Amino acid sequence: MQLQLDLYNSTRHPGNDADTMQTIKMVTEQNDRLNKMVKTLLDMSELQTVGRDEVIAVDALVDEVLADLEPLAQEKNIKLIGKCKDITLRGSDILIYRMVYNLVENAIKYNHLDGQVTVTAYQEENQVHLSVEDTGSGIPEELKERVFEPFFRVDKSRSRELGGVGLGLALVREIVRVHDGSITVKSNPSGGTIFEVVL
């Protein structure tokens, strides 16, 4: 289907009016969203088969995530800050990367212009605490547990604008679960939301 859309788009027939091109754009967006959904569902179905015995340098992993998401943050002039201690974590490098990536990406998307996203990690006894804090509008108290439900969106009116398929946080929760950890969401006293993972 994507090949057909690309081919149709590339021809740019003179007869294509604005409405037609808008329809093509919408169909392309929906196709991209469907592809992302299928990939995420496949990722979720394979979580149990991924090895989780790698030694992960948390600070290096967080730095990599922030570097990868810097272009997205720049679109909204959002400052990304890493405050991670020199600690290690045993688990799946690829899954922990995806967990942090999804949390930071979500924090950027739902943040305000000129906002800030801070990733903090430290060790307490035998557990690693990792939090992602943003300066956005926050999440209503009654919806905080629902954000981990597949396809749930706090602000449905912005689903097209923000992209995605509503599976990012559901995948995060599953990654935390297979690592025998916990995840909580709470309000930031200075505004915004804090997701805290304990592994």
Where are these regions (language model features)?
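Short conserved segment of the HATPase_c
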Residues: 139-153
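Short beta-strand/loop element within the Bergerat-fold HATPase_c
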Residues: 114-126
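Conserved micro-motifs of the catalytic ATP-binding
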Residues: 47-54, 84, 88-94
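Short alpha-helical segment of the dimerization/phosphotransfer core of two-component systems
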Residues: 26-34
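A conserved beta-strand-to-alpha-helix junction within the catalytic ATP-binding
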Residues: 54-70
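Short conserved segments within the C-terminal catalytic ATPase subdomain
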Residues: 72-81, 87
